[in-house]
A protein has these predicted regions:
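Canonical Rossmann dinucleotide-binding motif of NAD(H)/NADP(H)-dependent dehydrogenases/reductases
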Residues: 1-30
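Conserved glycine-rich Rossmann-like NAD(P)H-binding loop of the short-chain dehydrogenase/reductase
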Residues: 25-41
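Rossmann-fold cofactor-recognition segment
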Residues: 46-64
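Catalytic loop of short-chain dehydrogenase/reductase
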Residues: 88-92, 119-193, 205
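Short, small/polar-rich loop/turn modules that mediate ligand/substrate recognition or access, typified
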Residues: 197, 254-256
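Short, flexible catalytic-loop segment of classical short-chain dehydrogenase/reductase
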Residues: 203-213
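A conserved structural motif in NAD(P)-dependent oxidoreductases
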Residues: 228-239, 250
Length: 277
């Protein structure tokens, strides 16, 4: 049976790097992206290198689109590897859209893919270091709301428990990514019964078009690079290498955890030191 890898957000940045990292492993790469031009260009680039890659246009906030994607994947063969890199950052949208894409869309996608997960299948979902930078423990009442993202009134409940603060895109992004990390904990229990695995990955400051946009608009992003002990941004291929490992047989006992790949900036901030000292 055809061994299939599916990568969301595959048109550029870390998603494209993940597709390239999985190219030699899979018989077929399904490159899912909202941007048809990006997905098609990525498929052509990989195809020129001898990889069978097919673009698939999907918006993770669209239930019908996700249903079409899962139907397509089921018809292609055995879905062995999933890298869900699609998402948006604080400068790209209002708070409701950020949560809808980054958390609700992720929850909806994982729910739809669950029946396709068989023994040995593995998934990596992109979260972020953002919630790990918050020095304050999260409110348990907020976490209780956060853990039920598919409720029809989820956004209103989140606004009620967090207050007006969540309307700041950066705050909304951090909470959405915290929700992704916690979603993976629960999904690991469900998938484990089928012999499948799932982890999240939390990148730090990475040199991508999206990351550069954030850095241009927020000086705090540039400050985080300066505090990174390794003294630089990460590269998309460095994130993809970790994703590739987490999806491999070498990581067959890795399940339900978050992989922080940030050059040490969270460690430096928790230690209360300048990362370059």
């Amino acid at each position: 049976m055809t061994a299939v890898a599916m990568i969301t957000g595959a048109g550029r940045g870390m998603g494209l790097a993940c597709a390239e990292a999985l190219a030699e492993r899979a018989d077929l790469l399904v490159l899912a992206d909202r941007d048809e031009t990006g997905a098609t260009a990525a498929a052509a680039r990989l195809g020129a290198a001898g990889t069978r890659a097919e673009p698939f246009v999907v918006d993770v906030t669209d239930p019908a689109g996700i249903a079409d994607l899962t139907g397509y994947l089921a018809a292609q063969g055995d879905l062995r590897w999933v890298a869900h890199a699609a998402g948006i950052s604080p400068t790209m949208a209002d708070w409701r859209t950020i949560v809808n894409v980054d958390l609700i869309g992720t929850a909806r996608l994982l729910e739809a893919l669950r029946p396709l997960a068989g023994p040995g299948a593995a998934t990596v979902v992109f979260a972020s270091m953002a919630p790990l930078l918050d020095p304050n423990p999260p409110d348990p009442a907020a976490l209780a709301v956060l853990d039920d993202p598919l409720r029809t009134d989820f956004l209103d409940r989140l606004r009620n428990v967090l207050g007006a603060e969540v309307e700041q895109p950066g705050i909304a992004y951090s909470w959405a990514k915290r929700g992704v990390q916690r979603l993976v904990w629960r999904e690991a229990v469900r998938l484990g019964a089928a012999g499948a695995r799932i982890c999240s990955i939390s990148p730090g400051m990475i040199d991508t078009p999206q990351g550069r946009q954030e850095a241009r608009e927020h000086t705090s992003m540039r400050a985080l690079v300066e505090r990174t002990p390794l003294g630089r941004e990460g590269r998309p291929e460095e994130i993809a290498a970790v994703v590739g490992f987490a999806l491999s047989e070498a990581a067959s006992f890795l399940n339900g955890t978050d992989l922080l790949v940030d050059g040490g900036v969270v460690a430096a901030m928790r230690a209360g030191v300048d990362g370059r000292r």
